[in-house]
């Protein structure tokens, strides 16, 4: 991984599929407000193709509209975590926090059509293109087996934070996540 820098970071929230409007879903708007209160710029806007979250649509949007670059921190939740990982195969970012990440389509056709799972993951490139990688996993996630998160953590060397929540991190706030981001960006 790259050495951690202390320049001002921008946070980009990459939601799970189906989370639209984004500001009414889960902890996304709460995180944006909380970061703004701490002086951190945060992009939290509706994604194109919000239900299927196709890689061919999301990655150009993240690069071109969200302006992902070497000073951005990606916060990817569920499908957004997979989008973050695929983006980091080719794009340098400041870091990423992956929430409820997986590495397979779990045998679910609607996940397979997203395009994230149709080839091997480039784990080494992901690591090389980020200064830090943190991962939150629910040991009792109703959608993603915990073993999926462990596989991602083992391949990326993430700082794996495991919680027993049974909710796929689908809550209205997420104080631990805010604390993690602030610690990683040096604020």
Identify what each model region corresponds to.
Residues 75-84:
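Gly/Ala-rich beta-loop-alpha elbow adjacent to hydrolase catalytic centers
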Residues 173-187:
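Catalytic active-site module of serine/aspartate enzymes centered on a nucleophile-bearing elbow/loop
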């Amino acid at each position: 991984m790259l050495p951690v820098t202390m320049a001002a970071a921008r946070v980009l929230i990459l939601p799970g599929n189906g989370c639209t409007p984004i500001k009414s879903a889960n902890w996304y708007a709460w995180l944006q407000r909380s970061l703004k209160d701490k002086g951190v710029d945060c992009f939290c806007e509706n994604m194109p193709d919000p239900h299927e979250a196709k890689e061919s649509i999301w990655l150009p949007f993240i690069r071109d509209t969200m302006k992902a670059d070497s000073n951005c921190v990606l916060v990817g939740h569920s499908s957004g975590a997979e989008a973050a990982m695929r983006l980091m195969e080719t794009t340098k970012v400041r870091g990423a926090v992956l929430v409820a990440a997986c590495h397979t389509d779990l045998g679910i056709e609607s996940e397979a059509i997203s395009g994230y799972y149709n080839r091997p993951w480039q784990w080494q490139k992901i690591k090389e293109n980020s200064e830090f990688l943190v991962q939150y996993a629910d040991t009792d996630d109703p959608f993603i087996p915990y073993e999926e998160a462990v596989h991602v953590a083992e391949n990326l060397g993430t700082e794996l934070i495991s919680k027993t929540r049974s909710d796929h991190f689908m809550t209205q706030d997420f104080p631990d996540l805010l604390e993690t981001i602030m610690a990683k960006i040096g604020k």
